[in-house]
């Protein structure tokens, strides 16, 4: 398969699917293990924050690692370390007993997993242009299918996570997660693709830190990238607590792990359909209109969810949010891929990712205590109303018009 025109692209897609499934399981499993101990949303937010705080630095390092060490190598190393971090949960339970897997241990392991994950994701994304060209696909088509497959992993992952927790327990579920990462390693290990191996050192700065700064400067002085990064930073900070703390808290209080999996699956199913449909939608909607629709819809949906309606309505709203947000990642990927030179591609992807995650820990710090003190309804509103405001502000951002002007350097 590696010698066929589509072989490299299919291997990248398979790796994205299995790694996404592994991460999807952890979204359910880590908060569930914490909330089983004492039911505290604060503790759950601490572990969720531990799983996001390292992303700010890790994505910067990941981008540099991809450019300096090579995309294929970094992808495999990242997935191996991610597999070890989640496998450590059942290993510690076997050696020291279940009580050893406490909130502090889970926070450390979640942090380690979060530190390793971005490198693999960045490496796979930066290989897409060459893989798409070899397969004869347009970049929009490749990005939409890639994000759809990644979302499919997040559909399978939470579903497996909820079922495994109900049948095997939260700790043993981590074995399945480790296995998913190993499948990704196997796929990339047989990949052969131009630009995926050793990098061209002649176009790189000697110092890695200087290379990271070079990536930061490129993003900051490219107006469309700077605007996208700021919008994503705010949206991530407002949305992440809902998925990582508020939904787990709501369904844990009701002892409904399977229903939590359904909600996360609804988000991912919507995202899958939205990402798959983007290649067609892009013929009729501008990138700017697509993005504005996504941000405004997310704010409206979060506001309705704040009133904790019946589960069927929550599922519908989550599916809608996933659908309108599905094309956003392909749009971001396209703009990064078509504005950044090849030797800077990894660092630009890393910088954009790190800025998106910068607000996540702050949102989690605030959401956990607020949920314990004021309740889920007030916390949802505290997140949804600023999201609505972001949608209104985005309408008047002139740089977003450049989304439809991006072209290959």
Curated annotation (Swiss-Prot):
One of the GO biological process terms: response to antibiotic
GO cellular component, one term: plasma membrane
Topological type in the membrane: Multi-pass membrane protein
Residues forming coiled coils: none
PROSITE patterns tied to this protein: MFS
Keyword Transmembrane helix: yes
CDD domains the UniProt entry points to: MFS_MefA_like
Keywords: Antibiotic resistance, Cell inner membrane, Cell membrane, Membrane, Transmembrane, Transmembrane helix, Transport
Keyword Membrane: yes
Cleaved signal peptide residues: none
Matching SUPFAM superfamilies: MFS general substrate transporter (SSF103473)
Disulfide bond residue pairs: none
TM region(s), chain numbering: 10-30, 46-66, 80-98, 104-123, 144-168, 174-193, 218-240, 260-282, 289-308, 313-335, 348-370, 375-397
Pfam family, one: MFS_1
A GO molecular function held by the record: transmembrane transporter activity
Localization (cell): Cell inner membrane
Family statement drawn from the similarity comment of this UniProt entry: Belongs to the major facilitator superfamily. Drug:H(+) antiporter-3 (DHA3) (TC 2.A.1.21) family.
Protein task: Efflux pump that contributes to intrinsic antibiotic resistance. The pump uses the electrochemical gradient as a source of energy. Confers low-level resistance to tetracycline and to several aminoglycosides, including streptomycin, gentamicin, 2'-N-ethylnetilmicin and 6'-N-ethylnetilmicin.
Family matches, as PANTHER family: ENTEROBACTIN EXPORTER ENTS (PTHR23513:SF9), INTEGRAL MEMBRANE EFFLUX PROTEIN-RELATED (PTHR23513)
Protein name stated in the entry: Multidrug efflux pump Tap
Taxonomic source organism: Mycolicibacterium fortuitum (Mycobacterium fortuitum)
